[in-house]
């Protein structure tokens, strides 16, 4: 058999033409230090701030410091197997979290991974952790109410959709309870998506909250983002941004209204301080880094109400801050107070005296919520604030004098009754029309002759009576959002009719 050279050359040419080379270019570096949840990596040219890095063993990290000869990264998982000299690969991707309707009813960690044992989450929507907040042109003013179901708040510190309202107070005085009641109150309409971000809380507490939401039927429209106390600081730092990224998917892509709760931003700031000090950033006041204000302002500025041209959705943010011994002039509390559109101040003395929710009406304020309040609530809330202010002023003097004139006694009596009316149990949010008739009966003096210890009982029975015999009055307030003359006359008649049957 003779081999012809031209055949061999033809075969070789064909093989060469068919050959395809695939060159994969990776940006790689090596670990020069690892420990305390952070790593320093040498040789990553062109790394971006916030970029995702892949370490050996599948652990991911996020770039936070870009320095002259290395990058500082925080590690998002187990790092005991990572050692000096290990290869690190830059992914070229910014940190993202899954989003969309598939997340509803689930408990996820700060990376958006499910931790509730209900299987994987199937979603194609992803959102970047960091995003520039919407500008002035795309926003519109706050005009729609966000009902919390709590009389003390919906009347005196009203919250509108798209607002940022701070809940501030000492530990264990009902801050989280207000936030949870606000979520549970949405179960009737279910037109508000709720996201509860737990930062640095006990796992048992989060399990309890999830169980309560399931029991109350609130989990259908809620996502819980949990970064527990046992998790590394980077995950605690990321959790609020993950929550607001999920909220933006609903607001921008679907035009929906979202309520997001950050519980709490004090622990968030502490986690950021820990990371910053480990990354050797210069410390400032209370050892917080210089950009701790920006940490919270860029988060809370992402809450807004979009105009109809951009979908008309909204994000309402309720950040929580824990104070030490009522000190609202500390660093983090003053920062967040200046960023938000008002604050609900909870007082330990009121809580211990049995006034729950312990909202201090004098120190609490809502800067933009007033324009979102319904006319019916506005008509009773003005008198309510006045009655409480006069009562607080007189109650201090009444402790010293026994012989008070009739006008002073009448004001004290009215204040006591109104204070009783504002009491409300946990997990018992109330529809706005029932709140209005309760407060109306208090501020217009119909409870002045009811003993103080019977006011709560009177209110419960009176609302049952209104639901059964005077549902038309409640429906009129609900549908029109105001109390017209005809409705008011019916309401007065109903109050007097019930009072005649109420056994004191």
UniProtKB/Swiss-Prot annotation:
Main location, first listed in the record: membrane
Annotated positions binding ATP: 169-176
Site-annotated residues for Required for activity: 364
Origin: domain of life: Bacteria
Keywords attached to this entry: ATP synthesis, ATP-binding, Cell membrane, CF(1), Hydrogen ion transport, Ion transport, Membrane, Nucleotide-binding, Translocase, Transport
Topology of this chain in the membrane: Peripheral membrane protein
Keyword Ion transport: yes
EC number annotated for this UniProt entry: 7.1.2.2
Molecular-function GO term, any one: ADP binding
Cellular component per GO, a single term: proton-transporting ATP synthase complex
Locations listed in the record: Cell membrane
Catalytic activity, as annotated: ATP + H2O + 4 H(+)(in) = ADP + phosphate + 5 H(+)(out)
A Pfam family reported for this protein in Swiss-Prot or TrEMBL: ATP-synt_ab_N
Role: Produces ATP from ADP in the presence of a proton gradient across the membrane. The alpha chain is a regulatory subunit.
Family statement drawn from the similarity comment of this UniProt entry: Belongs to the ATPase alpha/beta chains family.
Quaternary structure and partners: F-type ATPases have 2 components, CF(1) - the catalytic core - and CF(0) - the membrane proton channel. CF(1) has five subunits: alpha(3), beta(3), gamma(1), delta(1), epsilon(1). CF(0) has three main subunits: a(1), b(2) and c(9-12). The alpha and beta chains form an alternating ring which encloses part of the gamma chain. CF(1) is attached to CF(0) by a central stalk formed by the gamma and epsilon chains, while a peripheral stalk is formed by the delta and b chains.
Record's protein name: ATP synthase subunit alpha
The species this protein was found in: Syntrophomonas wolfei subsp. wolfei (strain DSM 2245B / Goettingen)
């Amino acid at each position: 058999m003779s081999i012809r050279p031209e055949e061999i050359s033809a075969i070789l040419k064909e093989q060469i033409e068919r050959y395809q080379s695939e060159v994969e270019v990776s940006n790689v570096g090596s670990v020069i230090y690892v420990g305390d949840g952070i790593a320093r990596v040498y040789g990553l040219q062109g790394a971006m701030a916030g970029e995702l890095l892949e370490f050996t063993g599948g652990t991911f990290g996020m770039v936070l410091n870009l320095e002259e000869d290395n990058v500082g990264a925080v590690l998002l998982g187990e790092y005991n197997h990572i050692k000096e000299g290990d290869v690190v690969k830059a992914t070229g991707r910014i940190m993202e979290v899954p989003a969309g309707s598939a997340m509803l009813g689930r408990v996820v960690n700060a990376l958006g991974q499910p931790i509730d044992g209900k299987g994987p989450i199937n979603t194609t929507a992803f959102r970047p952790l960091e995003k520039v907040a919407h500008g002035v042109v795309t926003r519109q003013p706050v005009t729609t109410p966000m009902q919390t179901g709590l009389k003390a708040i919906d009347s005196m510190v009203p919250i509108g959709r798209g607002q940022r309202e701070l809940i501030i107070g000492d530990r264990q005085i009902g801050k989280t309870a207000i936030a949870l009641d606000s979520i549970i109150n949405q179960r009737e309409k279910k037109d508000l998506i709720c996201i509860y971000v737990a930062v640095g809380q006990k796992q048992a507490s989060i399990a309890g909250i999830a169980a309560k939401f399931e029991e109350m039927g609130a989990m259908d429209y809620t996502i819980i983002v949990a970064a527990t106390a046992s998790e590394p600081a980077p995950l605690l730092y990321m959790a609020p941004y993950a929550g607001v990224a999920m909220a933006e998917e609903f607001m921008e892509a679907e035009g929906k209204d979202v309520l997001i709760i950050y519980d709490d931003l004090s622990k968030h700031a502490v986690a950021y301080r820990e990371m910053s000090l480990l990354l050797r950033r210069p410390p400032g006041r209370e050892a917080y880094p210089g950009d701790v204000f920006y940490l919270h302002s860029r988060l809370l500025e992402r809450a807004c109400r979009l105009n109809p041209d951009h979908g008309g959705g909204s994000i309402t943010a309720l950040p929580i801050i824990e104070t030490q011994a009522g000190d609202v002039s500390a660093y983090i509390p003053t920062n967040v107070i200046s960023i938000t559109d008002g604050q609900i101040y909870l007082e330990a003395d009121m809580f211990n005296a049995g006034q729950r929710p312990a909202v201090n009406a004098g120190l609490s304020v809502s800067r933009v919520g007033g324009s979102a309040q319904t006319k019916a609530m506005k008509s009773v809330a003005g008198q309510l604030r006045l009655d409480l202010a006069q009562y607080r002023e007189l109650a201090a003097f009444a402790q010293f004098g026994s012989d008070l004139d009739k006008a002073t006694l009448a004001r004290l009596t009215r204040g006591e009754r109104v204070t009783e009316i504002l009491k409300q149990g946990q997990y018992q949010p109330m529809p706005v029309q029932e709140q209005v008739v309760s407060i109306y009966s208090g501020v217009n003096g119909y409870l002045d002759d009811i003993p103080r210890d019977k006011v709560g009982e009177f209110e419960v029975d009176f609302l049952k009576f209104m639901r059964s015999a005077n549902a038309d009055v409640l429906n009129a307030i609900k549908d029109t959002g105001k109390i017209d003359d005809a409705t008011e006359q019916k309401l007065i008649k109903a109050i007097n009719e019930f009072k005649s049957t109420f056994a004191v």
